[in-house]
Amino acid sequence: GVGFKAGVKEYKLTYYTPDYETLDTDILAAFRVTPQPGVPPEEAGAAVAAESSTGTWTTVWTDGLTNLDRYKGRCYHIEPVAGEENQYIAYVAYPLDLFEEGSVTNLFTSIVGNVFGFKALRALRLEDLRIPPAYSKTFQGPPHGIQVERDKLNKYGRPLLGCTIKPKLGLSAKNYGRAVYECLRGGLDFTKDDENVNSQPFMRWRDRFLFCVEAIYKAQSETGEIKGHYLNATAGTCEEMIKRAAFARELGAPIIMHDYLTGGFTANTSLAHYCRNHGLLLHIHRAMHAVIDRQKNHGMHFRVLAKALRLSGGDHIHSGTVVGKLEGERDITLGFVDLLRDDFIEKDRARGIYFTQFWVSIPGVLPVASGGIHVWHMPALTEIFGDDSVLQFGGGTLGHPWGNAPGAVANRVALEACVQARNEGRDLAREGNEIIRKAGKWSPELAAACEVWKEIKFEFAAVDTL
């Protein structure tokens, strides 16, 4: 019996280890596995562990030259998904040495790179990842984080207000800058480039940057508050992105923006490093996320993309509005909002959190609520998200019948009224409409906004932005 035993053998003989004790340094993954008919769940779970770590479809001679026990991924636990037929959660532990330090790109290439096309599976979804401190400490993380951002902006004790400039495509740079100025002058903290505003024929990036920064300075001098506009630096090459970021810095802009999924994690991490080194805040848009996270049984849950972003680096990230229709959605969204903001998050399956996550010293990221929200949602948003958030009203600002600046005034008055009411101990869930209506008596701008969008029912069941 010299040599090795060639041939195909079942994955579960090597990669299914139900008695494995996970190490503090292991990266842990929770996969939702839907096996093909006739494939036992243990084999499916082991196949995922194998194909996303050291395994291939057959035994190879060079297996003898490595220490499989040190390097293999292990499926250490499998449980059926309640209420779903033929779906299982497979827990996989990966040894730390399988991954390059400081590279989200390499982490994803390994864990979700190849295995999703695997024939033995009908579908596969990565639900959660546990990033151990030994790995997270190899990342810079967000350029600045929540506390440093508040200090830079000198804004405390309330959510920040933003607005995406619409129509998103077609405005000239000067008219675009005018819209920015009006919103900031009216009382918003930030305005935002839309995710697909890069550098198109109708508005080149350099012209936009100049007019927007002029708008920022004008609004700052008139209001005495620090203002910002998310200048979208996303471009076709990393070099071009850094060039745009450098120009923003030269102009004295406080914050730039990146589409991290279309731009890619490598580009995002480079940009985040540049931003920390040069004092720029970094706003992250999640364009393309639904391609990856919308299917319930295949792809990746957004909480994984959110964790990856906290490692790669960003100071703000879009995270849905939560004033959606489904109760469960709210808990799940708040689960990954906490994963973005807090240092330590306990395992809590009701909120979709499969693992206890300890971020050590990596700064927090501000969640951004945007999409179909307006002044009547303000009490719900204030209560749900708390102070550490950015509330973005695009149409809810620019759709005001009197124009952009009054739209901004309406939002700011509504927010300040909600924060004051909360600080006085009032119940925003029950008294929300009343608080907004009363504030409208002192602010004609808010009264006009209330009239346009009418009040909504306040079981927090408002707008469904899927």
From Swiss-Prot:
SUPFAM superfamilies: RuBisCo, C-terminal domain, RuBisCO, large subunit, small (N-terminal) domain. GO terms for cellular component: chloroplast. PROSITE patterns: RUBISCO_LARGE (PS00157). It is an enzyme of class 4 (lyase). Its main location: plastid. InterPro entries: RuBisCO (IPR033966), RuBisCo_large_chain_AS (IPR020878), RuBisCO_lsu_C (IPR000685), RuBisCO_lsu_C_sf (IPR036376), RuBisCO_lsu_fd_N (IPR017443), RuBisCO_lsu_N_sf (IPR036422), RuBisCO_lsuI (IPR020888). The modification N6-carboxylysine is found at K192. Mg(2+) binds at K192, D194, E195. Keywords: Calvin cycle, Carbon dioxide fixation, Chloroplast, Disulfide bond, Lyase, Magnesium, Metal-binding, Methylation, Monooxygenase, Oxidoreductase, Photorespiration, Photosynthesis, Plastid. Its EC number is 4.1.1.39. GO terms for molecular function: magnesium ion binding; monooxygenase activity; ribulose-bisphosphate carboxylase activity. It is found in: Plastid, Chloroplast. GO terms for biological process: photorespiration; reductive pentose-phosphate cycle. Its cofactor is Mg(2+). Binds 1 Mg(2+) ion per subunit. It catalyses: 2 (2R)-3-phosphoglycerate + 2 H(+) = D-ribulose 1,5-bisphosphate + CO2 + H2O; D-ribulose 1,5-bisphosphate + O2 = 2-phosphoglycolate + (2R)-3-phosphoglycerate + 2 H(+). The active site is at K166, H285. It holds the Pfam family RuBisCO_large. The record marks K325 as: Transition state stabilizer. The basic functional RuBisCO is composed of a large chain homodimer in a 'head-to-tail' conformation. In form I RuBisCO this homodimer is arranged in a barrel-like tetramer with the small subunits forming a tetrameric 'cap' on each end of the 'barrel'. RuBisCO catalyzes two reactions: the carboxylation of D-ribulose 1,5-bisphosphate, the primary event in carbon dioxide fixation, as well as the oxidative fragmentation of the pentose substrate in the photorespiration process. Both reactions occur simultaneously and in competition at the same active site. Heterohexadecamer of 8 large chains and 8 small chains; disulfide-linked. The disulfide link is formed within the large subunit homodimers. This is Ribulose bisphosphate carboxylase large chain. The lineage of its organism: Eukaryota, Viridiplantae, Streptophyta, Embryophyta, Tracheophyta.
